[in-house]
Amino acid sequence: MTFSVQHAEIHFNQNHIPVSDQFDDVYFSNENGLAETDYVFLQGNQLWERWITHKEANFVIAETGFGTGLNFFAATKLFRKFRQQHENHPLKRLNFISFEKYPLKITALSQAHLACPQFEDLSAHLQRYWPSLILGCHRIHFEETTLDLWFGDVSENLPQLGDYMNERIDAWFLDGFAPSKNPEMWNDDLYNLIFRFTKPNGTFATFTAASAVRKGLESAGFNVTKRKGFGKKRECLSGLKIQSKSTALSTPWYLAQPAKMEKQDFAIIGGGIASLCAAISLVKRGAKVTIYCEDAALALNASGNKQGAFYPQLSDDNVLTVDFYLHAFSYGRQLLDWAIEQNIAFEHEFCGVALCAYNEKSAVKLTKISQLGLPNEIFQMLSAEQLSEKVGLPLNCEGGWIEQGAWLAPRQFVQNAFSFLEKQGVIIKTAQKITALSQEEKGWELKNMQGQKYCHEVVILANGHKITDFVQTEKLPLYPIRGQVSQIPTSENLLKLKSVLCYDGYLTPANQLKTSHCIGASHVRDNVDRHFSEQEQQENQQKLQQNIAQPWTQDVNTSDNLARVGIRCSVRDLAPMVGNVPHFEQQQAGYYNLFNLRRRKQPIQSAVNFQNIFLIAALGSRGLTSAPLLGETLASILYGEPLPISEGILHNLSANRAWVKKWLKGSKVE
């Protein structure tokens, strides 16, 4: 498996229009690209008129070729105008999904945007967050619009929208290079998928009027109309989906199901990074959020360390887990930038992360990572000399270098970000241990230890290893892991450490006061004791000194016995969980014979979940990296919006995945 994507090879013609060398075709009209976009795509899909009559909170556009982003800019600016003129309209958000096989280099993108100064603000934001060359979905937030930019071949990526996106897309911009130049893209499989994902009464528009395209879209099920073409083109096509076709779900046991709600009233149980990130994504959608934290203050458990590393987990044997972390890393950096822009104060340093090949096993893992085809800013192998230069201290081994890695202060980040959200209307209730959940007529009733009751439409469980304390979740295969992080004083040598250093543990650079470092962490499964352990304190020191056999490591001194213990939540396959809370008894009844149902090709029901209970769980030791994308994914599911992850990743993060894997093999689940 490789995640690499190839850049577009282009040149600019005499009209300053970008031209693809791969397809020998212009990115937009030589005459007036913006006018062409307006006529072919915006008017062709009757966007303004449809927005006026739209009854839902979001509208979804999908596009088959992002190119320079001109169509996206034009649609976003039109939607901005619509929102300004219709502030109280139910339509609040625009989701824009676009596929691009050959992304432009940032320099070419910047040059192409010079032709459209009216989009300067959108262009600057896009260029700031232009993704690294990694296969898959990259979500970028704009004020009015959410852009899901899928890098890679549309024929491979479009199916990854999956069962969840059946009949969820309102309009299509069928762009990309001309069918005569790019015949591989324009095919019946594409047309059938487009029809499948289009809502009833959804539309498409395209610049081409090629007979094969028209016939293919008609065969897929669209009513196709010829329109006058733009400029010198005689004709173009638009179409309408009038009748649906029944489509069998490919994986009904993993189908994500949105919340059923009227008031957007959410309770989030938990006071750490998972709760925070879910709350941020919900508040951006206008939700009413109440936080229930059992501790006296927020971020007192696994999210409470003074320093934590921010980097992706790339050494997993499951490629879907690696895929998730790559995109979580990119999205998480975007969230950190947002927090900084909001003046949310937290110590941090974008200093890079070094992964040491401290033994044969770790060297093999790093070699595997180096074969994933990742861009250098995400991962590159360096010699011991090169890595030592990055780290600032001598190392005796080669290793991996994550240029965009960082450290930050988790407790500061969580507490101060929640203070920011309080000003946005989020209600925070501390010292509130919720002991039971019961479904009532008006929603879910939450009962605390004192017998007080609260009622909310939707409940999100994000309380770490205590998620399984509830009847609804007690069967989930989660377990606690005790972790002790040591705090050590700095020294003249340790002050030279310029990046996070990872081995069979980790060591952070000095904090911003230049007084101390964090070193950790112990890993004790099925242990929830939060008392200090002298043995684990010594082990934290010994791991560094054994793995990195250099004189400077003798400066590490844990004898002050300053440490902090947190209890993390994990699962055997080490991937997090997000989405619906599965109803074990009903899924067991429906799927215990799943192996034979599939073999006999018999009908299989969709997964039965607890209505309006959701979770974010099993973040393990990578919560700083994974929580932002998990929170955004959950919010997208809750609101029935497009997801920022592929169907394959979603399945890999589903809470019932361990059960399903057994049922699919004909094995029992106890």
Curated annotation (Swiss-Prot):
InterPro entries the UniProt entry points to: FAD-dep_OxRdtase, FAD/NAD-bd_sf, MnmC-like_methylTransf, SAM-dependent_MTases_sf, tRNA_MAMT_biosynth_bifunc_MnmC, tRNA_MNMC2, tRNA_S-uridine_synth_MnmC_C
Molecular function GO terms recorded: flavin adenine dinucleotide binding; oxidoreductase activity, acting on the CH-NH group of donors; tRNA (5-methylaminomethyl-2-thiouridylate)(34)-methyltransferase activity
GO cellular component entries: cytoplasm
One BP term from GO: methylation
Annotated region (FAD-dependent cmnm(5)s(2)U34 oxidoreductase), positions in chain: 269-670
Cofactor dependency: FAD
Stretch list, region tRNA (mnm(5)s(2)U34)-methyltransferase: 1-242
Keyword match Transmembrane helix: no
Keyword ATP-binding on entry: no
Top-rank taxon, per record: Bacteria
Keywords in alphabetical order: Cytoplasm, FAD, Flavoprotein, Methyltransferase, Multifunctional enzyme, Oxidoreductase, S-adenosyl-L-methionine, Transferase, tRNA processing
Subcellular localization, as worded in the UniProt entry: Cytoplasm
EC numbers on record: 2.1.1.61, 1.5.-.-
Recorded catalytic activity of this chain's protein: 5-aminomethyl-2-thiouridine(34) in tRNA + S-adenosyl-L-methionine = 5-methylaminomethyl-2-thiouridine(34) in tRNA + S-adenosyl-L-homocysteine + H(+)
Function: Catalyzes the last two steps in the biosynthesis of 5-methylaminomethyl-2-thiouridine (mnm(5)s(2)U) at the wobble position (U34) in tRNA. Catalyzes the FAD-dependent demodification of cmnm(5)s(2)U34 to nm(5)s(2)U34, followed by the transfer of a methyl group from S-adenosyl-L-methionine to nm(5)s(2)U34, to form mnm(5)s(2)U34.
PANTHER family, A to Z: SARCOSINE DEHYDROGENASE-RELATED (PTHR13847), TRNA 5-METHYLAMINOMETHYL-2-THIOURIDINE BIOSYNTHESIS BIFUNCTIONAL PROTEIN MNMC (PTHR13847:SF283)
Family stated for the protein in its record: In the N-terminal section; belongs to the methyltransferase superfamily. tRNA (mnm(5)s(2)U34)-methyltransferase family. In the C-terminal section; belongs to the DAO family.
Name recorded for this polypeptide: tRNA 5-methylaminomethyl-2-thiouridine biosynthesis bifunctional protein MnmC
Lineage: Bacteria, Pseudomonadati, Pseudomonadota, Gammaproteobacteria, Pasteurellales
